Amino acid sequence: MNNSALRAYLSTRAPDQIHSAFVAYLANLDLVAHQFPQIASDIVQELIDQRSYVKLIASENYSSLAVQAAMANLLTDKYAEGFPHHRYYGGCQNVDSIESAAAAEACALFGAEHAYVQPHSGADANLVAFWAILSRQIEMPTLSSLGVTAATHLSEEQWEVLRQKMGNQKLMGLDYFSGGHLTHGYRQNVSGRMFRVVSYAVDRDTGLLDYAAIEAQAKRERPLILLAGYSAYPRSINFRIFREIADKVGAVLMADMAHFAGLVAGGVFTGDEDPVRWSHIVTSTTHKTLRGPRGAFILCKKEFAEAVDKGCPLVLGGPLPHVMAAKAVAFREARNAAFKTYAHAVRDNARALADACIQQGMQLQTGGTDNHLLLLDVRPFGLTGRQAERALIDCGVTLNRNSLPFDPNGAWLTSGLRIGTPAVTSLGMGPEEMKRIARLIARVLGAATPVRTKTGALSKSAAEVPGEVRSSVCSEVRELLARFTLYPELDEPFLRAHFTRRPAGQNTCRRRDLNPYGVTPTDFESVVSASFTTSARAQPITRGTKGTAVHVVFLREAPCLPLREPLFFSHEEF
């Protein structure tokens, strides 16, 4: 399938036409394809797919090729349990250097006193923070009162008393249905099982945080941890007020800025809206508005540094040195002036998109946004969030359904959509494109209708969009994305030619594989055998699988998307 794509590229380009980023990308794929061609093909297909959809998922973005390259090296081979210069393994001097550099970059970027860059995910970071707080606030004072310095010195009876004490503390975070995250105390998550959770909610009428009500609840409950942050709240947070509340009740203020870390780093949220300034501990992911690798980190005041650095063995095992290297690169990138421009553009685009949605007659939770996301109520369209999500994906727009406050449709079907601007802003889109996207969303949702199940009842999960609407919207999506190319350094036709041809025996796909492309049975123009010579409208195919009845499907008009190669179906599947 592949006889050194890198060699082919270098042999056909003049020196001034060679792009170093593409060379690095090709070299990586060449190595992968030599061992496992399908994986290289799937990586290229993911690039094709991401270039084919307008990405409005608020928790996703596009990392730089430099960030990606920092992860593809031998650092992945190294165990480095512990923290810099205090490891459980020898020979970690280079990992010490990398982790220390990443932590220093994070501190400089956010103005933090201490940074811990080992967590693999936001959930991991929150667990480390929770246990660091429990350790410093509950465990260490208890050990001191017993005249010992470590839990290993306790008797079985003493340890059980301490364990029960640590497991009976209160966590007060934003309710899941008000926009809080699963890890903020949701009962189906470990956080809801390791604490006595006393969640606060947004105001039922305004959808906004009511700081007076939160203070009254905190005084009544007196939690160990007051947690501020969100995954689906479209407004900014006053962290100064949260800190004042925490101080009044003796709580530790923890902030989860996973969604808006890039807005903090870029100077969009400053003063009272800066969680790092006011919180004792701050957790975050690196891959959302911060545009880094998939991972997380923790920032904290000096008094919590020792407890946080014990994330291993408290919660984590070995860190991922190659990802910590990529985090360092991302933090350095975010310290550039260009990132500040980007961060402000993210919010400007979110506000422009919100205004345009309202002008299109759509209803937004809280009437707008202060950050990178907005919540759209789809009930006026007669749809559930799940139906709306599927209808838009079928038309080339990716986003996710989301519960609204006090949502009657629950957490699975939902009544809303969460829409974010980080990724489209990374592509260079601006307010005018946001207006166009709002029109596309309105057109799709206005045309979508629930489908009927086999029993004749209306489905709450599936919806269909008329073919002419889908075709029109997909055409606009293609035109829009053609002007804002993801990773323009990467030559897609070249990658297709060298990596996406399916080897014999692996060129079948199932009907459900077409769902992401918005293809329905009505799109089938004709079905012919692999050896059949057809008319000029459908080019013949020469590939097939040995011993299998394979048919090729020709699409009348591939709705949006990366269906530029024939799609194969086994006879049984078709």
UniProtKB/Swiss-Prot annotation:
Molecular function via GO: glycine hydroxymethyltransferase activity; pyridoxal phosphate binding
BP terms from Gene Ontology: glycine biosynthetic process from serine; tetrahydrofolate interconversion
Residue positions, PTM N6-(pyridoxal phosphate)lysine: 288
Record PROSITE patterns: SHMT (PS00096)
Family (UniProt): Belongs to the SHMT family.
Assembly and binders: Homodimer.
Annotated PANTHER family: SERINE HYDROXYMETHYLTRANSFERASE, SERINE HYDROXYMETHYLTRANSFERASE 1
Annotated HAMAP family: SHMT (MF_00051)
The keyword Transferase belongs to this UniProt entry's keyword annotation: yes
Pathway linked to the protein: One-carbon metabolism; tetrahydrofolate interconversion; Amino-acid biosynthesis; glycine biosynthesis; glycine from L-serine: step 1/1
Alphabetical list of InterPro entries matching this protein: PyrdxlP-dep_Trfase, PyrdxlP-dep_Trfase_major, PyrdxlP-dep_Trfase_small, Ser_HO-MeTrfase, Ser_HO-MeTrfase-like, Ser_HO-MeTrfase_PLP_BS, SHMT-like_dom
CDD domains, per the entry: SHMT
Keyword annotations: Amino-acid biosynthesis, Cytoplasm, One-carbon metabolism, Pyridoxal phosphate, Transferase
Cofactor: pyridoxal 5'-phosphate
Entry's localization field: Cytoplasm
Protein name (database record): Serine hydroxymethyltransferase
Enzyme Commission (EC) number: 2.1.2.1
GO cellular component term, pick one: cytosol
Source organism of this protein record: Treponema pallidum (strain Nichols)
